[in-house]
């Protein structure tokens, strides 16, 4: 993880740690001139590691975004941001996306009153995300919400009621609220050159 954030910069979905300020400068000096391919590859890897996806999963999302109307890059980011594991992370119910994925896999999370154990579940507007009524589930979420550093930075497409352990998806995310500094066009370019 630390090698990844040193090489690619801050990845809030992967870990809360930040690279040291001088390490980015050292990387640029050590590596010399960066080719266009390397720049595109690094942006793709940044997206992959932040959301915790395999290469095949990311490729699938790129194909879905390519078939939809509109900007492929923007739609790709919207698809990734509306995943259940990412929504839990953005609500502050988990400290990282892998942590949110574990909560979902262990069946602690309900969407609209039904247990969902698929982290890639695509949330829609007006979805209500809650925890199971079990004490253990509530204790896990309570710890994350209490220690969540980004509670005040909640994006406008989400609302949370920390006392009832309930989150609400208001709308599809707007591109300015995406939690990762990334040039999504470079990711789309990377995949368009691969085929």
Swiss-Prot record:
GO terms for cellular component: chloroplast; small ribosomal subunit. Residues 82-143 form the S4 RNA-binding domain. Keywords: Chloroplast, Plastid, Ribonucleoprotein, Ribosomal protein, RNA-binding, rRNA-binding. The keyword Coiled coil does not apply. The keyword Chloroplast applies. It is found in: Plastid, Chloroplast. Its main location: plastid. One of its GO terms (molecular function) is structural constituent of ribosome. InterPro entries: Ribosomal_uS4 (IPR022801), Ribosomal_uS4_bac-type (IPR005709), Ribosomal_uS4_CS (IPR018079), Ribosomal_uS4_N (IPR001912), S4_RNA-bd (IPR002942), S4_RNA-bd_sf (IPR036986). PROSITE patterns: RIBOSOMAL_S4 (PS00632), S4 (PS50889). It comes from the Eukaryota. Pfam families: Ribosomal_S4, S4. One of its GO terms (biological process) is translation. Belongs to the universal ribosomal protein uS4 family. Part of the 30S ribosomal subunit. Contacts protein S5. The interaction surface between S4 and S5 is involved in control of translational fidelity. One of the primary rRNA binding proteins, it binds directly to 16S rRNA where it nucleates assembly of the body of the 30S subunit. HAMAP family: Ribosomal_uS4_B. This is Small ribosomal subunit protein uS4c. It comes from Watsonia angusta.
């Amino acid at each position: 993880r630390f090698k990844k954030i040193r090489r690619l910069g801050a990845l809030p979905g992967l870990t809360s740690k930040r690279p040291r300020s001088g390490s980015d400068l050292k990387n640029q000096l050590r590596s010399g001139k960066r080719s266009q391919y390397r720049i595109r590859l690094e942006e793709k890897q940044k997206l992959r590691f932040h959301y915790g996806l395999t290469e095949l999963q990311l490729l699938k999302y790129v194909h879905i975004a390519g078939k939809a109307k509109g900007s492929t890059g923007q739609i790709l980011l919207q698809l990734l941001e509306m995943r259940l594991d990412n929504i839990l992370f953005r609500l502050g119910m988990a400290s990282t996306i892998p942590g949110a994925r574990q909560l979902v896999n262990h069946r602690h999370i309900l969407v609209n009153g039904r247990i969902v154990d698929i982290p890639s579940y695509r949330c829609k507007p007006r979805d209500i995300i809650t925890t199971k009524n079990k004490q253990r589930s509530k204790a896990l979420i309570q710890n994350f919400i209490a220690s969540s550093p980004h509670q005040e930075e909640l994006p406008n497409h989400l609302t949370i009621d920390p006392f009832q352990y309930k989150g609400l998806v208001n709308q599809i995310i707007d591109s300015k609220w995406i939690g990762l500094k990334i040039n999504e066009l470079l990711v789309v370019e990377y995949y368009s050159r691969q085929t």
